[in-house]
């Protein structure tokens, strides 16, 4: 029977979820993950503990629109209409309530600490039997690793406690509430709490028990906390493992702690001591603490490159050696410090190849499983990332163990963001909110500080800068001086950060915002008195078709030592799977669930799609971040290793010389490069081709053997140089038949053998081509100056909020999308060996001329059509997106073959990873399926394109797909696209960059804008 003090009515009346001074009730203190082994060998080998029991699985669930709607009887028994859900999960992914995607704007009315009366509430219940031995002695705990956003817990009708902070564990002592036989848990989860005001991250807002739930049985006298730290001499040849252990329970003289350090099966060091002993101040020391220090000779150091791990086992036992309990953790010997303006790991300056990562799954929402976590880490390592920022909250505890094992540097970030507050520091400068903020920072440190992968603490994200930040910065520095602290808020360089950590600062361009100027990263280093390293906490906003200009950042990182890299925003698109009326899955974004407010597709900024399929931009990141750099002088290749600790022991350098993609010579050389060292490779005499074409030297670094994170044959680095371009000399050929020109009132028609070309005299366009009796065009060949807008072109512009500075709004306002062609000239001439068509068009909008396009089409006796285009751009119109030609081809061929840059999509400001070669791909692979449709699939540096019976030659860029630019521009989701008749071909003489420094302001660098007044290009179109 529920006692009055345990009743739901009492809890509802108290309204703990609207009191920032109440962050928990009866919650146990934070600590590292425990297993409570009763066998030290099991602790050493990390076997599953017999004292731990998972409660994951089917729970009963009932949803209510508000906590007041929950019946009191639910505390005692399941409701008749309760459903079954899987724990962990977000209830929105089971059809209850709706997920909400918003970036800055709070999803509730801003009135802290109060939340709406309509506060969706999930009532979970579970019955279970307890091991009777657990009831006889010791303490049984329940651990909720993550509940969003706040919850009350009852056991057998009695109230146990309350917890909030959705991203850290809430742990309670159940011992007094359990009995023999069947026990019942009841968990009331509220969607909104005062804690929601501290959790305004750019992500889907979801609810429920979304991380693991487990029981843990510990002895009455137990290890209640332990943390380890490593210290070194100057040359890292000797180390000390310092282990601080705390106990709880009856303090007896015969209690001892033993700490043993293991490397595999070998015990490296061990020490035993009683509790107490260390004097803290004039009153003495802690009687329930002990600190042991173990000396280690020549430790194998931990780094992301070589993640050497030891195992520390902490045993609590009696003086006669009887084991009471053991806990354990992996240990990495490594040192992090800032010295002379540089962030150092084991004495070497780091170059952070980082990415921000949200915990997101397209089917499961914010529920992470081990398979997905490992998949993310492997992809990061395979693409030359060495660091990850837990944006913007502590991650699932398993994540850190995996980062320790595989080798990734981690920025561990507190679950604090108040981006929607005005001003942003409204709460973080308010002492009433210090307890809540303190819980989020201190508990993160207490949980995760044993992980060697965690090299930096972060105070949170986008919360302004307040006095609470300064207080928490000081607390971390006093408790854990072994790690730097970073925090971007308030200008990225406040007192509360050891690292200048701006977001979206540009390489050379200042953004002098009021109060918090965002300087260029180069300028920031040179500000008077500034000596800290600079690491961008967010940069290169990878939204849709983006990451233009990425190479510029990496040029700066390698040029200026104190520019020590950054974290790309971000890793994975946050789209969610929905199903149409036929049960077909499709990818949804903000607003697709009826969620208001929402920020549309701004949740999709990933280098990989939600299912972890890579975006093309990921290859650019991989190439720029590669650990081997190359230079070529004559026949000598200089290979420079950017590894700090790893000697190349699993790398072969493959080289190949090819002429227009045809191999002429190749070879293979083992790499033997010391950390930060160089190797010179002398190539044999290279062939000198006699035929025309481009001669390229390509090198690849291949790993012949599999590693923990890559398969055998993995390519880790590559580079390409153009050695020469031999031009052909066209000799007089045998006389060809002269094309025949026929003129009518409406058309010029040119015939040659079985081919015909038709030019409409009213439009001036090539309106049709025939090969035999087969039409080749579904639409005329026309000039094209626009593209289906990228996310970077749109910026923050939307129907209800127009940003006139966005590229798409400039193009719309100027009439680029509405421009119509006025024919100024269309003539035909028969030459000695060809027919020449000359056209001039003025592309106009509302009486204003935007572009003048002059074209000649020369069709000779070989059947080739040489197209020459000269375009003049009006001085008062915005720089165009492209200058090219477009048409709809009648044929749909299976494959596309081209000689140019590839194989992946590339753009003028994102092409350093592309290689010049002859490529052949299915037509479907020429389209990049961005969830929000846009311009996509461009291939630059093309010399030849073959598709169906057609061939184009010249120096151009192209994309080819079943979707027109018009359809891409008018369609909101990729699943709504339909394959059109034929194939759309876009051939560009020039194409604007895509940008990507951020996605809300124009970010295409000047050198990649089409700012010239006139353009000239040529194209040869023939049939094979």
Swiss-Prot record:
Residue numbers binding Na(+): 202, 602, 605
Recorded name of the encoding gene: lacZ2
NCBIfam families in the record: PRK09525.1 (NF007074)
Family: Belongs to the glycosyl hydrolase 2 family.
Cellular compartments per GO CC: beta-galactosidase complex
Molecular functions per Gene Ontology: beta-galactosidase activity; carbohydrate binding; magnesium ion binding
Binding site for Mg(2+) 2: 598
Cofactor(s) required for function per UniProt: Mg(2+); Na(+)
EC code: 3.2.1.23
Active-site residue list: 462 (proton donor), 538 (nucleophile)
SMART domains xrefs: Bgal_small_N
Site (Transition state stabilizer): 358, 392
Sequence positions that bind Mg(2+) 1: 417, 419, 462
Protein name: Beta-galactosidase 2
Quaternary structure, from the entry: Homotetramer.
Binding positions (substrate): 103, 202, 462, 538-541, 605, 1000
Cofactor binding note: Binds 2 magnesium ions per monomer. Binds 1 sodium ion per monomer.
